[in-house]
Design a protein with these regions (language model features):
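Acidic/charged, solvent-exposed loop-and-adjacent secondary-structure segments enriched in E/D, K/R, S/T
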Residues: 76-99
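N-terminal signal peptide c-region/cleavage motif recognized by signal peptidases
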Residues: 13-15
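Structural recognition of beta-strand segments within beta-rich domains
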Residues: 38-41, 46-50, 54-60, 65-68, ...
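A short, amphipathic edge element
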Residues: 101-113
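Beta-turn initiation residues at beta-strand->coil junctions
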Residues: 59-60, 77-78, 150-153
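Sec-dependent signal peptide recognition
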Residues: 2-9
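A short, Trp-centered hydrophobic/proline-enriched beta-strand micro-motif
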Residues: 20-38
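Gly/Pro-enriched, hydrophobic low-complexity segments
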Residues: 116-172
């Protein structure tokens, strides 16, 4: 279940730019807020989305790499060899819908509404298994790119992901 939370928190932010065939890359910061703790656990890294998959590299505080290719999820071991992560398969179709910003597929999984904050949407899961993990997602975009995602977990913890695209001029 922990891998499921990680996969969804890592990958839910791709709906806007995944629809293009052009590879997108950038950096991220992820703040994981746990109930009962005053300071969040913060990680930073980089990502690259290409037609053939996604690479998500955490640089700090602990280096790790997550890959999605051909409907499968992998992590890299100490020798940089991909290791299949069993149990992640049920989420690949959902993740692909998010990555492609397939609103028809997303509407099957979520109730989607505009958020009070301009440029943001709230997604409420319909699936019982997904509801056990998350109460809602907030997706925000700026200049046609995902800028922030907030994942509210059912247990009260939440994660905030922020994205930057340093190698791409921001659209006006």
């Amino acid at each position: 279940m922990r891998l499921s939370v990680l996969l969804l928190s890592v990958l839910v932010f791709f709906p806007v730019f995944a629809s293009s065939a052009v590879t997108e890359q950038g950096t991220f910061s992820q703040e994981k807020h746990f109930k009962g703790f005053s300071k969040p656990f913060i990680s930073t890294g980089s990502f690259e989305l290409a037609e053939d998959g996604l690479t998500w590299q955490v640089e700090s505080p602990v280096k790790s790499t997550l890959l999605i290719k051909q409907g499968q999820v992998y992590t890299l071991d100490d020798q940089d060899k991909p290791q299949l992560q069993k149990g992640a398969e049920p989420y690949v179709n959902l993740l692909q819908a998010i990555l492609k910003h397939d609103e028809v597929a997303l509407a099957e999984q979520f109730t989607m509404t505009d958020h009070a904050e301009p440029g943001c949407q709230t997604l409420l899961p319909k699936d019982d298994l997904l509801k056990q993990l998350f109460s809602q997602f907030e997706l925000c975009e700026a200049a046609e790119q995902v800028s922030r995602v907030r994942l509210q977990e059912a247990n009260g913890n939440f994660t905030v992901l922020r994205f930057a695209y340093p190698n791409k001029e921001q659209k006006q």
